[in-house]
Design a protein with these regions (language model features):
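Glycosyltransferase specificity loop/lid
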Residues: 1-444
Length: 444
């Protein structure tokens, strides 16, 4: 390593979306010659090895997840258990504090990056190490959601001083935020909002995968609120895939004309209720466009096949696939036949979509997803959101069809605006030198 090289420890939340996001930023640091020590659950390393692009600089440090009563043996990440057990994983992660302290004393890094371990800043400070709360969600989401409110209705609108924006929540979304923030015990006897506010208040800086051109006002709001630097890594674009699209999907997509296929994916953990699962795919059928939906089986079903509406498979056999397994999302999004991406609005998925040419249909569910949807659909005007019921949060097949047609059909005025805005943002994000400039500042 050079004289100016940094030693950085990464300790992300035990969820695959967080682990891969932290590894992505680790690859960027390694490109600049910095050394990374990446702490993760033992058996999870094999799932991440292929994404470590600089194994000579990024060293995985596997640790054993402490046993907590109620957790099945062998549990390591949120992918191993249903949502109600997540708090037990958080408790297990808190129990790793002595192990983390020992590692920090041994490694003597300049910085430690973390997200959910609210106790890490105080530990790092005692050891003379700077801590960075690296957020896997957007600055807009943190600015809107990180507040301790007494009632759900407070989340219908933004907090005082929030920048002018289209961002607000519907009643069903506000209730969901209130439940996560103030009702659901979030491990070790702490509420989610308490843990997140402590992490933000105690760290030395907060880091984001974003840029000023897209979210500058929200970063300024956060700097004033938490009185510390907001460091931006830039868009942190997905690495060019080293693999090729599976022949099965390449062959299937190749049979359709350019920009004609709907692709739908809701991430590795999201599961719909059966009736909403059926409304979604029936909406795709109504559009008349070919579609590929990569979805987990709905709640209560073992497979996607058993949850298909009666006669659906026969009616759509020539132009539709509902797949219950993992797919190469980044490669599918870049395929020339794909014209529309129906997304749950996870920040990582939106980042991948913004640098591709497919248009966005926004169907958020929980957490930061509604904020991301309003940012993309309202402030940036790069997507169309599927309408939902204000109280119950339910969508219909007709709502899905209408949103898809708005972005896909050439004679749609809204679609023309969306396509123009998306093209402008894509050109900006791919501009030569943009990401490198941001990341140089991030490292300094």
């Amino acid at each position: 390593m050079g004289e100016n090289s940094l030693k950085i420890v990464m300790y992300p939340w035990f969820a695959m979306g967080h682990l891969t996001t932290f590894l992505h930023i680790s690859n960027k640091f390694a490109e600049k010659g910095h050394q990374i020590f990446f702490i993760l659950p033992t058996k999870t390393q094999s799932k991440l090895d292929q994404f470590n692009l600089h194994p000579h600089l990024i060293k995985f440090i596997p640790i054993t997840v402490p046993h907590v009563h109620g957790l099945p043996d062998g549990t390591e990440t949120t992918a191993d258990v249903p949502f109600p057990m997540y708090s037990l994983i958080r408790h297990a992660m808190d129990l790793t504090e002595p192990v983390i302290e020992s590692l920090l004393r041994e490694l003597k890094p300049h910085f430690v990056f973390f997200d959910f371990t609210h106790w890490l800043p105080a530990l790092a400070r005692r050891l003379g190490i700077k801590s960075v709360h690296y957020c896997t969600i957007s600055p807009a989401s943190v600015a809107y959601l990180f507040r301790d409110e007494p009632a759900a209705d407070a989340f219908l609108g933004p907090p005082p001083g929030f920048p002018p924006s289209a961002i607000s929540l519907h009643k069903h979304e506000a209730r969901g935020v209130d439940w996560i923030n103030n009702v659901k015990e979030f491990g070790s006897g702490m509420k989610f909002v308490q843990r997140m506010l402590m992490a933000a208040e105690e760290c030395d800086a907060m880091g984001f995968k974003s840029c000023n051109e897209m979210e500058g006002p929200f970063c300024e709001f956060l700097e004033k609120k938490f009185k510390k630097p907001m460091i931006l890594a830039g868009p942190v674009l997905p690495e060019p895939p080293t693999s090729t699209l599976d022949e099965k999907w390449a062959k299937w997509l190749d049979q359709f004309k350019a920009k004609s296929v709907i692709f739908c994916s809701f991430g590795s953990e999201a599961r719909l209720e059966r009736d909403q699962f059926q409304e979604l795919i029936l909406g795709f059928e109504l559009t008349g466009f070919p579609f590929l939906a990569a979805l987990k089986p709905p709640i209560g079903a073992e497979t996607v096949e058993e949850a298909l509406p009666e006669g659906f498979r026969e009616r759509t056999a020539e132009r539709g696939v509902v797949h219950g397994g993992w797919v190469q999302q980044q490669l599918i999004l870049s395929h020339p036949s794909v014209g529309c991406f129906v997304t749950h609005c996870g920040w990582g998925s939106l980042s991948e979509a913004m640098v591709n040419e497919c248009q966005l249909v926004l169907l958020p569910d929980v957490g930061d997803q509604p904020i991301n949807a309003r940012l993309m659909g309202g402030d940036l005007r790069v997507g169309v959101e599927v309408e939902k019921g204000e109280e119950d949060g339910l969508f219909t097949r007709e709502g899905v069809m209408n949103a898809v047609r708005l972005v896909m059909e050439d004679d749609s005025e809204i679609g023309k605006e969306i396509r123009t805005k998306h093209s402008e943002w894509r050109e900006f994000l791919l501009r030569e030198g943009l990401e490198s400039s941001y990341f140089d500042d991030f490292c300094s």
